[in-house]
Amino acid sequence: MLSDFQTRLEEVERLVREDREEVGKRAGVPFIVFTYDPADEIEVDEEVRSLIEKLEYHDQTVAGIDMRDLVFSVLEERGILENVIDLERRDRDQLLSGLKSSLLDDGEMGQLASAIASQAENADTVIVYRMGILYPFASASTLMGQLETNTPDDTPIVFCYPATVDDQSLRFLDESEGTYYRARVIGHE
């Protein structure tokens, strides 16, 4: 018998392989939010890699985006990674404010959203995982809002996020991190 986790992952696979048009039909955007318990992070990493392999086996071009790696590479490209690490030790509040403006506030679309949108242009499916790194300086809701009009309508984007869903609000570590009503949410119990 499949666990709840595996059943929900199979639903994601079915949607992006067989029912792609269903992903955005109800909400108008091709986004899926797959939530999971933060304690399952290692299992999620393994299962996401397995899902990517399955989709590629079925002739899909998949952009697997490790958000942690993306955040570090953006900070490194800007030449501020070492400063961020130093500032984290000294002044966490200033760090959070600076990271938000560095990664999300760049006019209409921040650097993280730009990188995801760029990869979505050449992919059949995008899977973004290890998104817990965004909290608390950024919200998944803000990121999805920036991507909403900047990604292809026919490319499903799956966001694997360690959170719970409470009345359509994502909750990370028992704090509401924003509301995004348009994504299809495949939540855990």
Task: Enumerate the language-model features and the residues they cover.
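Glycine-rich P-loop/Walker A and Walker A-like loops and their local beta1-loop-alpha1 context
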Residues: M1-E56, Q60
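Residue-level preference for the first positions of well-ordered beta-strands
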Residues: V29-V33, T125, P156-V158
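Short acidic, S/G/P-rich loop/turn micro-motifs used as interaction or catalytic elements
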Residues: P38-E43, L70-V71, S101-M109, G132-P136, ...
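A short acidic (Asp/Glu
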Residues: I42-V48, V74-E77, P136-S141, Q168-F172
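Long, charge-dense
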Residues: A63-A113
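A short, acidic, amphipathic alpha-helical segment used as a generic capping/interface helix at domain edges
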Residues: E108-A120, L147
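Conserved P-loop NTPase "ATPase switch" module shared by AAA+ and STAND
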Residues: N122-F137
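Glycine-rich, aromatic-bearing surface loops/beta-hairpins
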Residues: A138-E189
